[in-house]
Amino acid sequence: MTEQLRQAALDFHEFPIPGKIEVTPTKSLATQRDLALAYSPGVAEPCLEIEKDPAASYKYTARGNLVAVISNGTAVLGLGNIGALAGKPVMEGKGVLFKKFAGINVFDIEVNEHDPDKLVDIIASLEPTFGGVNLEDIKAPECFYIEQKLRERMNIPVFHDDQHGTAIISAAAIINSLRIVGKKIEDVRLVASGAGAASIACLNLLLSLGMKRENITVCDSKGVVYKGRDDKMDQTKKEYAIEDNGWRKLADAIPNADIFLGCSAAGALTQDMVKSMAAHPIILALANPNPEITPPEAKAVRPDAIVCTGRSDYPNQVNNVLCFPFIFRGALDVGATTINEEMKRAAVYAIADLALEEQNEVVTSAYGGEGATFGADYVIPRPFDPRLIVRIAPAVAKAAMESGVATRPIQNWDAYVEKLTQFVYKTSLFMRPIFSQAKSAKQRIILAEGEENKALHATQEVISMGLANPILIGRRSVIEEKIKKLGLRLTAGVDFEIVDNEDNPRYEECWKHYYELTKRKGITPAIAKRVVRSNTTVLASTLLSLGYADALVCGLFGSYGKHLASIRDIIGLKDGVKTAAALNSLVLPTGNVFLTDTHVNSNPTAEELAEITLMAAEEIHRFGIEPAVALLSHSNFGSSDSLGAPKMREVLQIVKERNPHLMIDGEMRGDLAMNEAHRKELMPDSPLKGSANLLVFPDLSASRISYSLLRGTTTAITVGPILMGMNKSAHILNPGASVRRIINMIAYAAVKAQQE
């Protein structure tokens, strides 16, 4: 490690707050009543319920989503026996991964105890605190004994990740590598270098998957493990000892081996050894930080090899983060009393099968836009694949239920999988009613920028989710080439439709229609012909106007204003509507809030704002949410007559006249809009109850500044902008829109088209 990187790592852990984790309350502690409920005397009630029924601890405490990461520091990463305290940064890091990838809370516990029996007693005594235990960085062979004793004594999952996490990912890599080379697990011969916790766990799992014990040869630092050897032989090694056939070194055992499993040391596997392996060798060189052999070294002598390492700078990274958060997620969610072999095997196949699917846009973005398809350089999923949680956790949970170790079985699997998506896509719960409605009657949705990578990834997801029938505008050759490059499973004419703007059979109909709509706006036939061929938003709007689609989504490049001008010219405003406007939603940890007008009107009149407010309230209803509207200003309830305050008071009167049942009040400052207690101090009889969920701003500057601040200073996720007031469902995103935002907008556009 360079000195610069070393210092960066130290700074990362020290600033702005030492360490990587903290405890955050999940309940409000703002009032005396809150304290009385959270602690004395209110806390006595859940205590008494748990005393009557210990299972109630999962109902009234955080235990069901809390895992202990426990280590004695005897085998820390590649650092060895550095002690419990020195290993604490690693354990905190493990906790961060649990939280990031699976939403699981963690207490890291470093125990300064080397005696296995005492360590077992200490850990077992902590069972009332946790829903599961992740053992970490405990050296072999003690780790085998400790885990086994804890599994016998505890009624919660105990999982030594160094053993089983590595084993599960390695097994998935081997399963898929065998698929690629056309070999069967019961026929192949494996040579292992290393006989520590990870290696033995890998071998045990492979046996349960069908590998034959007689086809396995194990080597350690003393050479081949064979019957009759006395040096450094413990019980776990003896189980894999072969008959003495004269082999003494790794070099003796490796010729004609199909698989090399390395959990040993850098350089242990030489190029000469690789040369001697069977056809299409499978090499797992998992030593860290440097593998037994690097992929370039192995490929130089055996181009037909499939090589996996533990490093992120090579293909096929065997990384435990691919499984441990999701195995615990599934185990916790069904109240599993253990993690058994059935659950591990379920995880293996869930991981292996995911690699067979098309690439996800989140993964592609995380790896610099680089796509991958199943093959020698992509045998297991990548760690940032958001589908891991929705594949592994349900598979593990089902296996727990089927094998009889689940105490809280899942009844509704669709709802469970949807709940899991919230750990990846924060808009999932918010968009649930929209997705359900979109699926009920699929609409034809045009994506104006169909050649964009994000549009193609969104199309793949939309089709997989059954949300709509996409129509992509773009050059057919470009779209098909990008689909291939991105590793997507899309077929034009089967999964989606292409409208090739350079070879459009409806070209004449489109340009003539566009000309008729715009001939009094300076558009000549010659201009119309050129624009319809070159401007994809114009073409999309024209197709929508002609009835060849039900809705459109555009804006992945170009300015909002130019897209809006095209849509307004061709689609036009809805009957009775005088102005278009934009509505954005922000999904915040404290709830969802809508803001308007965020894109269109720079300084709308009171009449225009009233119309915008009523349109926004109608849009909010589509999400199954009852609008609670705050008209914002710098003043509160008539305290000022300057700037936009009088205008907002006029808006209130107009809206009340047109919709007396809408919950609305104003004008008011933003803090009053979001805090009912403060609002009541100034206006006790305000009809607005709770926090406002629709914020109406006096002008574009105020709305854009507020929107940007909320997005930039919170963890808010945006949905929108939703274009309101148009004659058909047409919406404009922005160039920074994520694939998920495109998917959300396609679904919303579809629902709006259904209802209009």
Swiss-Prot record:
Pfam families: malic (PF00390), Malic_M (PF03949), PTA_PTB (PF01515)
Covalent S-S links between cysteines: none
Cofactor(s) the record lists: Mg(2+); Mn(2+)
Presence of keyword Signal: no
A biological-process GO annotation: malate metabolic process
EC number of the protein: 1.1.1.40
Catalytic reaction(s) noted: (S)-malate + NADP(+) = pyruvate + CO2 + NADPH; oxaloacetate + H(+) = pyruvate + CO2
Listed name of the protein: NADP-dependent malic enzyme
Source species: Haemophilus influenzae (strain ATCC 51907 / DSM 11121 / KW20 / Rd)
